Amino acid sequence: MAPTQSKVRIHNLAEAHEKTLRAFPIEVEQNPEGKKLLVKQIRIRTLGHADHSNDSICFLNTYGFIKEAVSQTEFMRAGQKSESKNTLTACMLPFGPGPNIGSPQKMLEYAEDIKIHVRKTAGCKEQIVFSLDRTPQVFRGFQFPRDRYACVPSDKYIKSPGKLVAGPNYCYIITFLSLTFCPSSQKFKVPRPVLNFRSTRMRGIHLEIIMKITCSENSPIRKTLITDDLENGPKASVWIHLCNLYKGRNPIKIYDEAYFAEKCKQMLLSVGISDLWGPTIAVHANGKIPKSASLYFNSRGWALHPIADASPTMAKQLWSIGCEIMEVNAILQGSDYSALVDHPDVIYRKIRIDPAKKQYAHSKWNPFKKAISMPNLTDDSI
């Protein structure tokens, strides 16, 4: 029989981060030929006490579409415009952290000059390689333009990677820009090897984030959500690995569930959500961090967890729908798999939720429903 569970809830949100996350309102206009065009937009947010000083940084995230690039071997006469290729699928590509931008409103205009190629490859998993061929100066301080390429699992940033086949050249067209200003002290993403580490001498602490999803009643996404609470709407559960706690070797101490629950309480954890590397869970430890957990936080007690790493499917759903953090639980489990299956979960329900940053608001744009053709995703320079 499966082990029973007890829970501990976290009541407040991380300062400077919201419990909601807003998406882009969709605006459509017609060109002179009568075709419907999707209006490109930029969203600018400031978290906490971040301003345009030297102590704050800017996260840049992009949303758009992948299409087949125009062939460079076509014959063209003078004055003829290259024909648009069909849009294949929606895509998100985080540019990562960068310098503080003094005039962010102009970045949407400069984004039209960015040229990004998209290719498939394979390792132990199917992968997508984004390579930057051309970028304006204003973008070059961000992480992706500095690296010039990014290789990720194919399902991480692309809605339908199965539509990309061998042979054609593909490009990524940016339609939405999301800029988030935050203090530089909050920039810390836990290294993947640290997150994957397990040991028989450790107990693992995970966070379960329960989010209310704001989607329509006829949305196909509802089939993937928790719908047993009709009054409060559909919900989704996302788990992230927070840290490991050392059991210790002191024969006098009792390293039971109460001991680890007390350690969790002493950290005074708080949680919020923002658009950094895509939808990202921000965790702040306001109290005492155990020595064995120090690798999972920066010196200010912050840790950022992109949902695209923890749950790619859920992250892609949040491109087009809103969410609000309703509940956060800390779960204590055995770190080693053998200990995990033999011991029950201990769940701590007193994790704080930031009331200003607990929502990811609803958007009318839905990359999971082909409702409108978007021929404006053409660029003669591509």
UniProtKB/Swiss-Prot annotation:
Database matches in Gene3D superfamilies: Viral matrix protein, C-terminal domain, Viral matrix protein, N-terminal domain
GO biological process: virion assembly
Pfam families xref list: Matrix_Paramyxo_C (PF23765), Matrix_Paramyxo_N (PF00661)
Functional description taken from the UniProt entry: The M protein has a crucial role in virus assembly and interacts with the RNP complex as well as with the viral membrane.
InterPro entries assigned to the protein according to its UniProt record, in alphabetical order: Matrix_C (IPR042539), Matrix_N (IPR042540), Matrix_Paramyxo_C (IPR055413), Matrix_Paramyxo_N (IPR000982)
Gene Ontology cellular-component annotations: viral envelope
Compartments it resides in: Virion
Similarity comment: Belongs to the morbillivirus/respirovirus/rubulavirus M protein family.
Gene Ontology terms for molecular function: structural constituent of virion
Superkingdom of the source species: Viruses
Protein name: Matrix protein
Organism the protein comes from: Human parainfluenza 4a virus (strain Toshiba)
